[in-house]
Curated annotation (Swiss-Prot):
Family in the record: Belongs to the ENY2 family.
Principal place of residence: nucleus
Source organism (scientific name): Schizosaccharomyces pombe (strain 972 / ATCC 24843)
Keywords of the record: Activator, Chromatin regulator, Cytoplasm, mRNA transport, Nucleus, Protein transport, Transcription, Transcription regulation, Translocation, Transport
Protein name in UniProt: SAGA complex subunit Sus1
Amino acid sequence: MYDLIFSTKMTTEKIVEQLYETGDYERLANELEYKLESCGWTTQLRDYTRGIVNSDSKIDFQKLYESALQSATESIPDSVKMDLLKDIKTCVLKLANPPESANGGNKM
């Protein structure tokens, strides 16, 4: 099945483009946002960044961003990562194996 994806030369850019076209990109983003909010990750990250600013009011944006980015990526729950990867895989496989055409799949 994975060979089919590569044999059709589906580049990352093409996959993202097709995910946008099908609406799956927005759906995946919304689901990720919901899951991160539901598990308290967004609140945890907000509190973390506020704590940094409160302890060092002279911190520049770039340092705050780098610190927050590292903490953010490390603290995403594994269950959220696995669910997202599963959903992405399903979408990519759907793109690689489109449903038969409206003519009932008859090949000429």
